[in-house]
Amino acid sequence: MRVVVIGAGVIGLSTALCIHERFSPVQPLHMKIYADRFTPFTTSDVAAGFWQPYLSDPRNPQEVEWNQQTFDYLLSHIHSPNAEKMGLSLISGYNLFKEEVPDPFWRNTVLGFRKLTPREMDIFPDYGYGWFNTSLTLEGKSYLPWLTERLTERGVKLFHRKVESFEEVARGGADVIINCTGVWAGALQADTSLQPGRGQIIQVEAPWMKHFILTHDPRLGIYNSPYIIPGSKTVTLGGVFQLGNWNELNSVHDHNTIWKSCCKLEPTLKNAKIVGELTGFRPVRHQVRLKKKQLHFGSSSVEVIHNYGHGGYGLTIHWGCAMEAANLFGKILEEKKLSRMPASHL
């Protein structure tokens, strides 16, 4: 079985690994990964890697399960020898609001979810309500190299190649194509639901910051209010979500907005040294596109599994989506097996 995965962000690499781990013991797989960007130049490398879905219920109820599966998978690795290389760690902190809001659907997934006390709220005088919980961080700059190493150990080949069409890959001999091209998926097949959600972050040295602080303002929308997420070596400052903006250059205006708002939220950051600044595009869609489809090119056909449109929560949902993609791959194998069986003469 010849399999080509297009895309080498967290979705592409994790999907490739999940499928290879599950099916290579029972079905010889010749797997290749094509991408024009590999770590450290993917959107996943820009992400702080904090596990937290959006606050609102997803349109597709399956996404709740995929988020849960990802958290459980990562939590099972938290004390493993691989945790450090994966960039995986526990982190506690705050979600802050101007006024009371309903509890999120993931309140029973994270650890120790509770409402903030009046004394805790005194620490954040600009906010009137909040939550505290323990979650996970999974830093893409570590996790993607770890996934890549696991795949190469299994004999998966990675190629720096820009794919122009599914037909090009199909005519190259692929039996199954797995489309994990993120925000660029529309270049392979029109998808009017897919848009870039531009984000910009500042990375600082602030080792005294131990807790995440995420603020939320419904008037501004998701990711447009300040957030602070400590990592293993640096702290990520953010607060930009610009739908439809394809500008990949860092913006001075956005830099100033992020810096001022984060320093107001946590005044000690004024003393932090800025060590990096990055811009990336979240693949925004009304819901994740995770489905299989057969495409025909003349007399030939190829099976395609689409897995893209994860917005700003790709690392939060990636393993659950990889497991579902593997389920779809298993159905393709079963269908191909049945199609090869001789017809019954009973």
Curated annotation (Swiss-Prot):
Compartments where found: Peroxisome matrix; Cytoplasm, Cytosol; Presynaptic active zone; Secreted
A single Gene Ontology CC term: extracellular region
Positions of short motif Microbody targeting signal: 344-346
Name of one Pfam family that matches: DAO
Keywords: Cell projection, Cytoplasm, FAD, Flavoprotein, Oxidoreductase, Peroxisome, Phosphoprotein, S-nitrosylation, Secreted, Synapse
PROSITE patterns: DAO
Entry's EC annotation: 1.4.3.3
Domain of life (superkingdom): Eukaryota
Keyword Phosphoprotein: yes
Transmembrane portions of the chain: none
Keyword check for Flavoprotein: yes
Binding site for D-proline: 227, 282, 312
Residues where D-serine binds: 223, 227, 282, 312
GO biological process assignments: D-alanine catabolic process; D-serine catabolic process; digestion; dopamine biosynthetic process; neutrophil-mediated killing of gram-negative bacterium; proline catabolic process
Catalyzed reaction equations: a D-alpha-amino acid + O2 + H2O = a 2-oxocarboxylate + H2O2 + NH4(+); D-alanine + O2 + H2O = pyruvate + H2O2 + NH4(+); D-cysteine + O2 + H2O = 2-oxo-3-sulfanylpropanoate + H2O2 + NH4(+); D-dopa + O2 + H2O = 3-(3,4-dihydroxyphenyl)pyruvate + H2O2 + NH4(+)
Single GO MF annotation: glycine oxidase activity
Chain intervals for the UniProt region annotation (Active site lid that may open upon substrate/product migration in and out of the active site and close to increase the hydrophobicity of the active site, to make the hydride transfer reaction more efficient): 215-227
Function: Catalyzes the oxidative deamination of D-amino acids with broad substrate specificity. Required to catabolize D-amino acids synthesized endogenously, of gastrointestinal bacterial origin or obtained from the diet, and to use these as nutrients. Regulates the level of D-amino acid neurotransmitters in the brain, such as D-serine, a co-agonist of N-methyl D-aspartate (NMDA) receptors, and may modulate synaptic transmission. Catalyzes the first step of the racemization of D-DOPA to L-DOPA, for possible use in an alternative dopamine biosynthesis pathway.
The protein's name in its UniProt record: D-amino-acid oxidase
Upper classification of the organism: Eukaryota, Metazoa, Chordata, Craniata, Vertebrata
Record gene name: DAO
